[in-house]
From Swiss-Prot:
Listed transmembrane segments: 83-103, 119-139, 158-178, 182-202, 214-234, 241-261, 325-345, 358-378, 398-418, 424-444, 496-516
Protein name: Transporter mfs1
Pfam family, one: MFS_1
Organism in which the protein naturally occurs: Schizosaccharomyces pombe (strain 972 / ATCC 24843)
Family affiliation: Belongs to the major facilitator superfamily. CAR1 family.
Recorded coiled-coil stretches: none
GO terms under biological process: xenobiotic detoxification by transmembrane export across the plasma membrane
Gene that encodes the chain: mfs1
Keywords: Endoplasmic reticulum, Glycoprotein, Membrane, Transmembrane, Transmembrane helix, Transport
Localisation per UniProt entry: Endoplasmic reticulum; Membrane
Glycosylation sites recorded in the entry for this protein: 486
């Protein structure tokens, strides 16, 4: 079965069995009897320059898809195969993202076990999220290398992620716990940095936004359900079982993606086709465009592309800088709430550890409701516009949905902060978090899609830089969250003024999508990176 053949399991079977994939050489127009004879000289060849491979000026045979309907092209896979891959990416993202928040219910027990203060233990959350920032700088560019692809990075990094949970669970000091948490964040990051790219590999542009929503739900569900599952482990067993559970869930994901997740990278699939043709014909001139481009990069240039370009884009491009700061703020609020929720619901409402884990469900409910609305918006507004204009319309129009979303964030913060008091039922502040879920979801969807449309040639670097700054901002937020809320009060609304500070900052950010909508085209015309 072709689906299993393209998975890691299929590749391992092929490697250890000594098998070689057969290529339909007549279909590709390959002359196999003499590797030095040009294709045009093969009288029985069905070669068609415009349909398949082309010979460039250097005599290299550029390997491409066999027309628009080539069945090996991921965009032409059957629907069931695309749905399986989508599920794999979403489940992988859910499991890895859960690793950050599953830690929080055990902070008190870890503090008591290791005889340290609260802030040093919170570093276990901070360093894990900081790993999200560092990982994409490494793994995102590697996933674009044709010889590597995405699949191997997913599997190998997840194996390391699983192994890191063992010393984390067995550790008896922060000297063990903290480095392991940071490394786990680094090796868990590929799903977060390239998951969207995997979906873009298989879905047509007008369908891609729909399935990005499901991936986003996986990204939301992980940190939302993490505290609940972590709390259950802390109550039933101990804080160490948070990491054993994370290891078991991740191991299940590893089994699934090993057997049921084929490679989706177009450049890697074409590279493997070119490699098979080289082996079959003995002609070394079969190359892909990506293979040629990557071979022209020196190690220094590749390192610069990985480490320097993302930072340059984030700092020098006004559009990227402003949206990165905005997204970083919204992302930070979620991790601030990992400290604010226990303060409010334990101090004011006297919730148990398990009940504290349940309060995050408001964010998940809000995200699901927003997805339903967003589907309607896509179907009625964006997709018809995309089809009518054949995908060619000002990128700034993608930001329209972010206009109301920008107001939802401060509304949520003021609502949550000042309704969290003993005289108000506990469900009321939770309802306030629904506005955050809706606002953050719509902001993330619109802003990331806009950045991809505005910087198509450098989208990997833009997203890597965004992940670096966004995750760094979020990583720092738990360290000052408890002090901010405890020191601002007041006692009858313990998260009131702290939420107000965040709400005011969010209000300052509201004009950003409006300004980019108005001036974005002019800014892009002056940029050497944007289109």
């Amino acid at each position: 079965m072709w689906f299993l053949r393209e998975t890691i399991f299929g590749e391992l079977v092929e490697y250890f069995s000594g098998g070689t994939r057969q290529v339909d050489v007549e279909k590709l127009g390959v002359c196999t009897d003499n590797s030095n004879v040009e294709l045009s000289s093969c009288p029985d060849s069905s070669f068609d320059d415009e349909k398949t491979n082309q010979v460039n000026s250097e005599g290299l045979i550029i390997v491409t898809w066999d027309g628009e309907d080539d069945p090996e092209n991921p965009k032409n896979w059957p629907l069931w195969a695309k749905l399986v891959v989508t599920f794999d990416v979403c489940f992988l993202t859910f499991a890895v993202y859960m690793g950050s928040a599953i830690f929080t219910p055990g902070i008190q027990e870890i503090r008591e076990t290791m005889h340290v203060g609260t802030v040093p233990v919170i570093l276990g959350l901070t360093l894990f999220v900081e790993g999200y920032a560092v990982g994409p700088l490494i793994f995102s560019p590697l996933s674009e290398v044709p010889q590597i692809g995405r699949q191997k990075i997913y599997v190998l990094s997840l194996i390391v992620f699983i192994c890191l949970q063992i010393p984390t669970a067995l550790g008896s000091s922060l000297g063990v716990l903290l480095p392991m948490r940071f490394l786990a964040g680094v090796f868990g990051s590929p799903a977060l940095s390239t998951g969207g790219a995997s979906l873009a590999d298989i879905w047509q542009p007008w369908l891609y936004p729909y399935f990005m929503c499901f991936w986003s739900l996986g990204a939301v569900g992980g940190p939302v359900l993490g505290p609940l599952l972590g709390a259950a482990m802390v109550v039933a067993k101990s804080w160490r079982w948070q990491f054993w559970l994370l290891m078991m869930i991740s191991a299940l994901v590893l089994v699934i993606i090993t057997f049921f997740m084929p490679e989706t990278s177009e450049w890697h699939l074409l590279y493997k086709r070119a490699k098979r043709l080289r082996e079959l014909t003995g002609n070394p001139n079969y190359k892909t465009e990506a293979e040629i481009a990557s071979s022209q990069l020196s190690k220094g240039q590749f390192a610069k592309q990985i480490l320097v370009r993302p930072i340059i884009l984030c700092v020098s491009e006004p559009i990227v800088l402003s949206l990165t700061i905005y997204i970083g703020l919204v992302y930070s609020i979620l991790y601030l709430w990992f400290e604010a929720f226990p303060i409010l619901f334990t101090t004011v409402y006297h919730f148990t550890t398990i009940e504290n884990g349940l309060v995050y469900m408001g964010i998940l409910v809000g995200s699901v409701l927003t997805v339903a609305f967003y589907f309607i918006y896509l179907r009625k507004v964006m997709i018809p516009k995309f089809v009518e204009n054949k995908g060619k319309f000002p990128a700034e129009e993608i930001l329209i949905i972010s206009f109301p979303a920008a107001f939802f964030i401060p509304i949520s913060l003021f609502w949550f902060g000042w309704t969290g008091r003993e005289s108000v039922h506990w469900i009321v502040p939770i309802v306030g978090t629904l506005f955050y879920a809706s606002g953050s979801f719509l902001l993330f969807q619109s802003m990331f899609q806009y950045l991809a449309a505005a910087y198509p040639k450098y989208v990997a670097s833009v997203f890597a830089g965004n992940a670096l700054f966004r995750s760094s901002m979020a990583a720092a937020s738990p360290l000052y969250a408890r002090a901010m809320f405890n020191n601002t009060g007041p006692s009858y609304a313990p998260v009131g003024w702290g939420s107000t500070i965040l709400g005011v900052i969010s209000c300052i950010m509201i004009p950003i999508p409006f300004l980019i909508y108005k001036w974005g085209l002019k800014l892009r015309s002056r940029s050497k990176y944007a289109t």
